[in-house]
């Protein structure tokens, strides 16, 4: 697994370094700290961090691709692989893998044991969020550009259809005039001179052929658009266009915790879009959910994942007016 992670890290250097430099320039006032020096080869023997995700109750988890910031020798986010110890973020749609119930965003500890509260780590997480949001904006831009191109082609097709209809009308009118002229010259003989009609018909076939080509091009654009958006969405792991969870909708076991996290880095306007549909229930943040986040099947985490953003509907762990371990009421989202 480690050789694969190293290969994966090298693969992403070229593709992610340029956007990363943009992030660094945009937020240079937050970069007085030294760059991270964590190494994926370093062994960090912690029985809690070496557990498979399924052993801590995380099933059907999405893996986040590596994200590089200029000056860092290792990615901010590495493929989680078989254990939860890599530096990164894991999305799990639910505790038991179903499409409904509890879901969460997990921010796992650094592989070298660096705490989540350090300045460098916090800034790294903010950059990760910006990266994911940027990928979502890229997907939106791709979609908008494709729609504009498709609209222009649709206008051309409408114009062609109008010409085709006018051409058919002219063909029928010419046919009628020719027949009337033939009858007038010799009512007993009806000679069908097909040359004029053939000329108009050929023009009509040319229009229809062009229209067919336009339809094929539109189909290709739609296919390319769908593929491009799918690729972009696969990168935007933290930014799913279903349910928006705003910071004001979050309740923390420590009320200042999430606010401190937001205020501590450059991403001041955080919006987490989590795949919950429909979006009913509770949202909360906790640094140590512990036994509060468990179902009848398995505990969600043993507390080794410092930040957790969860959603619970009425069928989940909490009722709409449940409470956390410290007795604070959880507002319904």
Curated annotation (Swiss-Prot):
The signal peptide, as residue positions, is 1-16
The protein's UniProt keywords, in alphabetical order, are: Glycoprotein, Signal
Sugar attachment sites are 204
Q: Does the keyword Glycoprotein apply?
A: yes
Per its record, how is this protein called by name?
Uncharacterized protein ECU05_0110
Species for this entry = Encephalitozoon cuniculi (strain GB-M1)
């Amino acid at each position: 697994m480690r050789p694969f992670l190293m290969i994966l890290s090298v693969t992403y250097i070229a593709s992610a370094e340029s956007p990363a430099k943009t992030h660094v320039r945009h937020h240079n006032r937050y970069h007085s700290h030294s760059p991270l020096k964590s190494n994926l080869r370093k062994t960090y023997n912690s029985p809690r961090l070496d557990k498979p995700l399924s052993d801590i109750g995380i099933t059907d988890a999405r893996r986040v691709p590596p994200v590089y910031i200029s000056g860092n020798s290792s990615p901010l986010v590495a493929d989680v692989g078989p254990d939860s110890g890599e530096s990164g973020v894991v999305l799990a749609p639910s505790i038991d893998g179903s499409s409904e119930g509890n879901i969460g965003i997990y921010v796992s500890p650094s592989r070298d044991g660096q705490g989540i509260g350090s300045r460098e780590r916090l800034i790294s997480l903010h950059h990760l969020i910006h990266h994911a949001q940027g990928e979502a904006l890229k997907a939106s831009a791709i979609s908008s550009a494709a729609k504009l191109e498709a609209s222009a082609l649709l206008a051309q097709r409408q114009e062609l259809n109008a010409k085709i209809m006018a051409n058919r009308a002219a063909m029928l009118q010419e046919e009628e005039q020719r027949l009337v002229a033939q009858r007038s010259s010799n009512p007993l003989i009806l000679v069908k001179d097909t040359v004029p009609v053939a000329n108009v018909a050929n023009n009509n076939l040319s229009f229809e052929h062009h229209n067919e080509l336009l339809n094929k091009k539109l189909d290709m654009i739609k296919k390319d658009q769908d593929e491009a958006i799918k690729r972009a969405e696969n990168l935007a792991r933290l930014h799913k266009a279903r349910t928006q969870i705003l910071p004001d909708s979050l309740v923390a076991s420590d009320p200042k915790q999430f606010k401190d996290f937001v205020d501590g880095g450059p991403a001041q306007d955080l919006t987490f879009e989590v795949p919950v549909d429909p979006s009913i229930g509770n949202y909360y943040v906790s640094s140590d959910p512990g036994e509060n986040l468990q179902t009848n099947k398995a505990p969600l985490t043993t507390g080794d994942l410092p930040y957790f953003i969860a959603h619970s509907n009425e069928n989940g762990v909490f009722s709409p007016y449940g409470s956390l371990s410290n007795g604070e009421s959880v507002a319904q989202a």
